[in-house]
Amino acid sequence: MRQSGRKSNQLRPISLELSPLINAEGSCLIKIGNTHVMCSATCETTVPPFLRGQNQGWITAEYGMLPGSTSQRIKREAALGQQGGRTQEIQRLIGRAMRCVIDVRKLGERQIIIDCDVINADGGTRTAAITGSYVALHLAIRSLMKKRVLKVNPLISQIAAISCGIYKGEVILDLDYLEDSDADVDSNFVFAGNGNLIEVQGTAEKNPFSEEQFLAMLKLAKGGAAELFKLQNQVLLGS
């Protein structure tokens, strides 16, 4: 039995608040248990130098954790003068994932910047950021099409992400911080709307894991992602 009382295949309570930020083209506050991430999507009429003159766009991402988001205050990376390796890894993951579900050729020479700010961290911040960022991106595209900045919808697919791991010998879904910090295996799965995989990250923290255990995690994660896709659709169709 998990300390939270959840079943092995049970997600934490989830909510998606649409458009909490009034200035961004799209924004979403995602809450998965006690992990809360503010996600926004902003459009700029510039592209990276390597894309200039090619009439196609780009999506990039930035990720950060507020100082009070964890039990011990995190120093602002701006004050330190450089980003940490974890921050760079996560924002690259988010950017890669978002580029998999959008046709950047249909953006024209525009760049959409995804910003993910962790307000409260209790495990699974990167997966929450990806799931919330899709909603923010969807709203941004909707806004740009309404303003006729974009003529064609460039979105190809939904995207959602969830963590899965092996904790005390049991395969479990959506690890919170206590589970994550003591897990035998910690993995993250990023899915497209049709169930195909976009990215998998898996690490054995103590002992190697078997192919059978990996497939069990994949199955559990796929079921969790299906629930996330359903929630995304519900909130977006209702907005």
Curated annotation (Swiss-Prot):
It catalyses: tRNA(n+1) + phosphate = tRNA(n) + a ribonucleoside 5'-diphosphate. The keyword RNA-binding applies. Its EC number is 2.7.7.56. One of its GO terms (biological process) is rRNA catabolic process. GO terms for molecular function: 3'-5'-RNA exonuclease activity; tRNA binding; tRNA nucleotidyltransferase activity. NCBIfam families: RNasePH (TIGR01966). Homohexameric ring arranged as a trimer of dimers. Phosphorolytic 3'-5' exoribonuclease that plays an important role in tRNA 3'-end maturation. Removes nucleotide residues following the 3'-CCA terminus of tRNAs; can also add nucleotides to the ends of RNA molecules by using nucleoside diphosphates as substrates, but this may not be physiologically important. Probably plays a role in initiation of 16S rRNA degradation (leading to ribosome degradation) during starvation. Belongs to the RNase PH family. This is Ribonuclease PH. It comes from Rickettsia rickettsii (strain Sheila Smith). The gene is rph.
